[in-house]
Amino acid sequence: MIHSLFLINSAGDIFLEKHWKSVVSRSVCDYFFEAQERATEAENVPPVIPTPHHYLLSVYRHKIFFVAVIQTEVPPLFVIEFLHRVVDTFQDYFGVCSEPVIKDNVVVVYEVLEEMLDNGFPLATESNILKELIKPPTILRTVVNTITGSTNVGDQLPTGQLSVVPWRRTGVKYTNNEAYFDVVEEIDAIIDKSGSTVTAEIQGVIDACVKLTGMPDLTLSFMNPRLLDDVSFHPCVRFKRWESERILSFIPPDGNFRLLSYHVSAQNLVAIPVYVKHSISFRDSGSLGRFEITVGPKQTMGKTIEGVTVTSQMPKGVLNMSLTPSQGTHTFDPVTKMLSWDVGKINPQKLPSLKGTMGLQVGASKPDENPTINLQFKIQQLAISGLKVNRLDMYGEKYKPFKGIKYMTKAGKFQVRT
């Protein structure tokens, strides 16, 4: 299925390649580079690129393109999901997935890729199994391997591979037994000039960090599970139990894993947590324009909005901007015409604002459209959809674990039209 994998940085350099069948020439990536040049942003590169003899399927994460080369038609989402699993595995192994880290651990990277695919077909993709096959790198292990000439490859067949629970290894023991769950929701929205919502949806995930002794069996129930739509589960979840009772029942993998991802698309369930007041005017023949925006909280259940960043691509006719922020710092690049305002935390008693004048090109016509304002923010201890965990129960083991639930909402593609 997958013949080769190329890792390409944002500068267009191939810094790692892996071949499972025959060696595919690097020249096949020329088609990818052509598509990259045509795309305005890295995220806009087509995920599937047909060539005369191959198909190129790619994902872009952590400023790296992971490009798979296949020769026969396969379901694209199957390959793309595998590429995401590769990235998640690297992140689990090395803490971060970046070009320097991959280069520093290139031997382990090749060993992991060799185990994840067998003759081009996915084989071992569970992190628990891979860590028994290929030991994660540590400073001590690296020093020992350098001196002895040994590798990170395990000397025993992983027990989970032969188990009815292949995602969990046997014989797990912890002094402190704990299970943490993070409910993270990302809101994508387009707000029109009047402040009305054009479109809004929520992409949510529940990430888990489970460190429990033995073979625990967990059940996780929600206060309002019916609002979840288009749910994707980790293989450990018993789907029939979810279908009948809307309860998550599972034997968890050991360590960090994504329990489920979900989608909330019903407009009445998506609360917009921020609003933007704006006044942007360009004069027909004058050399000055006015710019003023204010950001405030809305439907946040009393939670603080923090990490707020406002960006806007200004028209080409704007030469410079003389602005004064009530808080935070701002920059304007006269070359790219990009305005950026790092607001920070929003105080409801004193709303942050940015106001001033714009220097316009003399004689330039008035722009056809006002700029779009893009927001980034996060809200701790709030799931904007209203999702709440009711309780977490454990069966099969006699000890009492420590349990914790954390919520967070953050902005995805959040745009305000002016």
Curated annotation (Swiss-Prot):
Q: One of this protein's Pfam families, by short name?
A: Adap_comp_sub
- Cellular compartment(s): Golgi apparatus; Cytoplasmic vesicle membrane
Residues forming the MHD domain are 176-417
InterPro entries according to UniProt: Adaptor_comp_med_subunit (IPR050431), AP2_Mu_C_sf (IPR036168), AP_mu_sigma_su (IPR022775), Clathrin_mu (IPR001392), Clathrin_mu_CS (IPR018240), Longin-like_dom_sf (IPR011012), MHD (IPR028565)
Is the keyword Transport assigned to this protein?
yes
The family line of this record is: Belongs to the adaptor complexes medium subunit family.
What name does the UniProt record give this protein?
AP-3 complex subunit mu-2
Ranked from the top, the taxonomy reads: Eukaryota, Metazoa, Chordata, Craniata, Vertebrata
